[in-house]
Amino acid sequence: MQEKDASSQGFLPHFQHFATQAIHVGQDPEQWTSRAVVPPISLSTTFKQGAPGQHSGFEYSRSGNPTRNCLEKAVAALDGAKYCLAFASGLAATVTITHLLKAGDQIICMDDVYGGTNRYFRQVASEFGLKISFVDCSKIKLLEAAITPETKLVWIETPTNPTQKVIDIEGCAHIVHKHGDIILVVDNTFMSPYFQRPLALGADISMYSATKYMNGHSDVVMGLVSVNCESLHNRLRFLQNSLGAVPSPIDCYLCNRGLKTLHVRMEKHFKNGMAVAQFLESNPWVEKVIYPGLPSHPQHELVKRQCTGCTGMVTFYIKGTLQHAEIFLKNLKLFTLAESLGGFESLAELPAIMTHASVLKNDRDVLGISDTLIRLSVGLEDEEDLLEDLDQALKAAHPPSGSHS
């Protein structure tokens, strides 16, 4: 169920009880003998058994941990899912999901994805006999044309990283499931479950680099996977234990804490992201702004149909050359030049040289990841300070004629 939000600006209404669930699901003090209101960090690697083979829910911390259990329950609720599994990183989650397949199976991956996902599929998974096809899944007909009898998994991001194409999740799910037993995975890192719930739109798996918005404080590396299908959950739980790429209890504690302010943070990210996008769109030294929340985005109407809002991810092309982009980035004072995204602090980066350097240059050219494409992760600072910083950096990159740099 969803509740109405007068400030939704034409987007879907926010998911009902989101804040309450983020604060309370999986956190019941009654589960601890101490009645701790905040779930404690359970660092023990092993747990006492009452008799051989008789345990109270936990045996060995790789297989299950009380702190991780609290986090997984909370995320499942926020994703509108029955189950959630936590992993050591987003890529650890990706690797585990890929282990659902066998040699000879085909993966169809959105052509515009996180550079680490592209690298793993292209340079690692393909070496183990998996067939990888990169397709522009924003065009449903191209996706359907790429499906073969060997297709077992379709992997999409929406919005994509970094060019922010938006994919019709419901449309993809209809096509994918029409062709048989194919798993549809949506990397929901850019949106978080606060703004988008892929499972409700027909996806089989909703996954995250929890390093980003879910944790939100740039101090945890983690991955999360949410599912509704019991058999799929059982297979993934087996692989989670067998492959062993699980997060530490401390990281689980921190991410669980981050969830408590997710709803508040995402609203501020949306507000600041929109302000930055509008400012850049009106700036004469900006060639083009890509932000799904702007009416100028080619898939803005689709965004409003499947999302409750947008985040702080803003992509734009600065006018000029690589030199102009570098001068802009070097002159930023509030935005930090760094990779990653989704933290409380504002970041800026040059994907062609940083996060997407592992993507083949020809592919970058086709995707539009040029030397003048800049990706911003707009944080929670005061709006006027963010705009002032962008303004002075743009002026440094494009000084008025007659001035000296």
Swiss-Prot record:
Highly expressed in liver. Also in muscle and lower expression in most tissues except heart, pituitary gland, spleen, thymus, and vascular tissue, where it is hardly detected. InterPro entries: Cys/Met-Metab_PyrdxlP-dep_enz (IPR000277), Cys_met_metab_PP (IPR054542), PyrdxlP-dep_Trfase (IPR015424), PyrdxlP-dep_Trfase_major (IPR015421), PyrdxlP-dep_Trfase_small (IPR015422). Pathway: Amino-acid biosynthesis; L-cysteine biosynthesis; L-cysteine from L-homocysteine and L-serine: step 2/2. The keyword Transmembrane helix does not apply. Changing residue 240 to E: In CSTNU; strongly reduces catalytic activity and affinity for pyridoxal phosphate. Catalyzes the last step in the trans-sulfuration pathway from L-methionine to L-cysteine in a pyridoxal-5'-phosphate (PLP)-dependent manner, which consists on cleaving the L,L-cystathionine molecule into L-cysteine, ammonia and 2-oxobutanoate. Part of the L-cysteine derived from the trans-sulfuration pathway is utilized for biosynthesis of the ubiquitous antioxidant glutathione. This is Cystathionine gamma-lyase. The gene is CTH. GO terms for cellular component: cytoplasm; cytosol; extracellular exosome. GO terms for biological process: cellular response to leukemia inhibitory factor; cysteine biosynthetic process; cysteine biosynthetic process via cystathionine; cysteine metabolic process; endoplasmic reticulum unfolded protein response; hydrogen sulfide biosynthetic process; lipid metabolic process; negative regulation of apoptotic signaling pathway. Disulfide bonds: none annotated. Homotetramer. Interacts with CALM in a calcium-dependent manner. Changing residue 67 to I: In CSTNU; reduces catalytic activity and affinity for pyridoxal phosphate. Substrate binds at residues 62, 114, 119, 339. Optimum pH is 8.2 with L,L-cystathionine. Inhibited by propargylglycine, trifluoroalanine and aminoethoxyvinylglycine. Coiled coil: none annotated. It is found in: Cytoplasm. It catalyses: L,L-cystathionine + H2O = 2-oxobutanoate + L-cysteine + NH4(+); L-cysteine + H2O = hydrogen sulfide + pyruvate + NH4(+) + H(+); L-homocysteine + H2O = 2-oxobutanoate + hydrogen sulfide + NH4(+) + H(+); L-homoserine = 2-oxobutanoate + NH4(+). Its EC number is 4.4.1.1, 4.4.1.2. Keywords: Amino-acid biosynthesis, Calmodulin-binding, Cysteine biosynthesis, Cytoplasm, Disease variant, Lipid metabolism, Lyase, Pyridoxal phosphate. Belongs to the trans-sulfuration enzymes family. The keyword Lipid metabolism applies.
